[in-house]
Amino acid sequence: MSREPVPSSFDEGNPQFTEETGMQKFTRRLKEEPLVPLGCAATCYALYRAYRSMKSGDSVEMNRMFRARIYAQAFTLVALVAGGMYFKTERQQRREFDQAVELRKKQEKRDAWLRELEIRDKEDREWRERHAAIEAAAKEAGNKAAPRKEPEAARSSIEPADEKSIGVMDAVRALISRN
C-alpha cells in the first residue's frame, strides 16, 4: 500500500472538480454577443467626445455627442434583446447542460467521498487486525513466559535465597525457618 495521502474530494484545487474560469466565460459571452461590447465601446467614445467638446466650449458638438451616446445605448439594448431572442434556445440548452454538469460534479464528489470513506474504513480495519494480532501474540508470549510449577525433584540446586527476586531479609528468614 502506498504511503501517499488519500486524495480528498473536498480539495478545492482539484482540476477534476473545476469547470469554466471567469475569463473563459467572458470570452464565450463575447463570442456569443459581439454587438453588445461594440455598443458599449460606442457609448464610451461618445461620452469621451462630449467631454472633450465641453472642455473646449463647443456646445453644438457636445449636444451631438450626447445624442450619439443615446443612440449607442439604444443600439446596445437592441443588440442585447435581439441576441437574447436569437440565443434563447442555445441558452436554454446551455442551462440544461450546466445543470447536468453540476449534477455530474455532485455525483462525482459524492462517489469520491464514498471511495475515500471506504479506503479509510479498510485502513482502519487493517490497523485493528494488525493490533489484534500483535496483542494476541503478546498474550501468547506472556502465557509461555509464565513460570510453571515444577515437581520438587526437578528443581535446580539453587537455594531459594539465591534467586534474584528474593531480598536479603527474606533470604535470612527462609534460612531461619528451615532450621
UniProtKB/Swiss-Prot annotation:
Tell me a GO cellular component. Answer: mitochondrial membrane
Q: GO terms for biological process? A: mitochondrial respirasome assembly
Keywords tagged on the record: Coiled coil, Membrane, Mitochondrion, Transmembrane, Transmembrane helix
Top-rank taxon: Eukaryota
Q: Where in the cell is it found?
A: Mitochondrion membrane
Annotated function: Cytochrome c oxidase subunit which plays a role in assembly of respiratory supercomplexes.
Which PANTHER family did the record assign?
HIG1 DOMAIN FAMILY MEMBER 1A (PTHR12297:SF3), HYPOXIA-INDUCBILE GENE 1 HIG1 -RELATED (PTHR12297)
Which family does the entry's similarity section mention?
Answer: Belongs to the RCF1 family.
Which named protein is this? Answer: Respiratory supercomplex factor 1, mitochondrial
What organism does this protein naturally occur in? Penicillium rubens (strain ATCC 28089 / DSM 1075 / NRRL 1951 / Wisconsin 54-1255)
Q: Which gene encodes it?
A: rcf1
